[in-house]
Regions:
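Long, charged N-terminal accessory/stalk domains
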Residues: 1-186
Length: 186
């Protein structure tokens, strides 16, 4: 049973690596090396999945921050420590009430496709009650999220490069391991 599973994993890995490219400068085929390569590919694939999810999250955070521009979240903490609450809101143009500018010190930050993005600056103890969606922003600046996106994209490219190297060099070892496992099954 284990041999059948191993055979399936080897076949799937060979197929995936073959899709990445033809074997070129191959290392001498070794069934033992083939099993090592199988584990290396599993680790790289797992890492790739994590990186892709991480990149998706960073891209969502980036999209959430873009209408607000680039600012340091620490500056909001300084305002809070000084007794002020800064809240972020979004509403349709029709829902925005200019009276909020007087009552809550509302300031429009951006207008994007008939949506108004604005902040309120009030004393900490003042309760803000608006007919608008309150926005929770990520804990870092737009610049930081852009850097995190770039670093994650680079890590994905590095991961793909490692897989491409295995595809170039190690397919014969995987085939040798597959042959050995299939011989055990028979």
């Amino acid at each position: 049973q284990d041999s059948i599973r191993l055979s399936s994993r080897l076949q799937a890995t060979l197929k995936m690596l073959h899709g990445l490219g033809e074997a070129k400068e191959t290392t001498p085929a070794s069934a033992a090396r083939g099993l090592e390569v199988l584990d290396e590919v599993d680790v790289l694939q797992s890492e790739k999945t994590k990186l892709q999810q991480q990149l998706q999250n960073y891209q969502k955070e980036k999209a959430a921050l873009e209408p607000w521009g680039d600012f340091e979240p620490e500056s909001l903490n300084l305002l809070h420590d000084a007794g002020f609450a800064v809240n972020f809101y979004c509403c349709s143009e029709g829902s925005y009430d200019e009276a909020w500018e007087e009552i809550y010190n509302a300031m429009i930050i951006n207008c994007v496709s008939s949506r108004i993005y604005f902040i309120t600056v009030t004393k900490n103890e003042v309760e803000v009650d608006l007919d608008a969606e309150q926005i929770k922003l990520p804990p870092y600046s737009l610049t930081r999220v852009q850097i995190l996106c770039q670093e994650t994209e680079q890590a994905l490219a590095d991961n793909d490069q490692k897989l491409a190297v295995l595809a170039e060099k190690e397919q014969p070892s995987l085939q040798a391991a597959l042959k050995e496992v299939n011989t055990e099954i028979e």
